[in-house]
Amino acid sequence: MGKSNSKLKPEVVEELTRKTYFTEKEVQQWYKGFIKDCPSGQLDAAGFQKIYKQFFPFGDPTKFATFVFNVFDENKDGRIEFSEFIQALSVTSRGTLDEKLRWASKLYDLDNDGYITRNEMLDIVDAIYQMVGNTVELPEEENTPEKRVDRIFAMMDKNADGKLTLQEFQEGTKADPSIVQALSLYDGLV
């Protein structure tokens, strides 16, 4: 993408409009903001973490932001270009429940082997607990990452093999209204 250009080429806007749930005008607006914050046209992990720190000032979002960064960074070059950013934003903010669940499963499947292991889920849940800090009062049965993961696996790991397939993850998540609600949090806000 162009260095500090305030406008995208029409063919790029058209392509991103086709690939996302955003209008041409919205793509242009997001690009303008992206270039303002990232004049190089790219966002690195440290910059991404800084953004998360603004939203979670009472916890430590570093670990979670790194996990999210890795999902946004589709081509795995250590930087998020605008096209990667807008496509991930589209799914997380306006995608269908199944699209959001596929995206979330990429977040949890840290080694990209198609399964979410207990340890992978523990890494993510621990990162979430660090990020929110003491700002959220958790029920006794979920007040540690380990307890939360035990509860999730008891509910979702139907064949008790210690790992979740995409199907188990999707079905289990849909059966838990609190998870569906969390995934729908940003609907209509962007």
Curated annotation (Swiss-Prot):
GO MF term list: calcium ion binding; calcium sensitive guanylate cyclase activator activity; voltage-gated calcium channel activity
Q: Report domain EF-hand positions.
A: 24-59, 60-95, 96-131, 144-179
Where is it chiefly localized?
Golgi
Where Ca(2+) 2 binds, per the record, is at D109, D111, D113, Y115, E120
Residues reported in the UniProt entry to bind Ca(2+) 3: D157, N159, D161, K163, E168
Q: Which residues bind Ca(2+) 1?
A: D73, N75, D77, R79, E81, E84
- How would you describe this protein's topology in the membrane? Peripheral membrane protein; Lipid-anchor
User: Signal sequence: where?
Assistant: none
Instruction: List the InterPro entries hit by this protein, alphabetically.
Output: EF-hand-dom_pair, EF_Hand_1_Ca_BS, EF_hand_dom, Recoverin
Record lipid sites (N-myristoyl glycine): G2
Report the family membership.
Belongs to the recoverin family.
Physiological role: Neuronal calcium sensor, regulator of G protein-coupled receptor phosphorylation in a calcium dependent manner. Directly regulates GRK1 (RHOK), but not GRK2 to GRK5. Can substitute for calmodulin. Stimulates PI4KB kinase activity. Involved in long-term synaptic plasticity through its interaction with PICK1. May also play a role in neuron differentiation through inhibition of the activity of N-type voltage-gated calcium channel.
Q: Which additional comment does the entry carry?
A: Binds 3 calcium ions via the second, third and fourth EF-hand.
Oligomeric and partner information: Monomer. Interacts with KCND2. Interacts in a calcium-independent manner with PI4KB, but only if myristoylated. This binding competes with CALN2/CABP7 binding to PI4KB. Interacts in a calcium-dependent manner with PICK1 (via AH domain). Interacts with ARF1, ARF3, ARF5 and ARF6. Interacts with IL1RAPL1. Interacts with RIC8A; interaction is favored in the absence of Ca(2+) and myristoylation of NCS1 is not required.
Protein name in UniProt: Neuronal calcium sensor 1
Q: Which organism is it from?
A: Bos taurus
**High-level lineage:** Eukaryota, Metazoa, Chordata, Craniata, Vertebrata
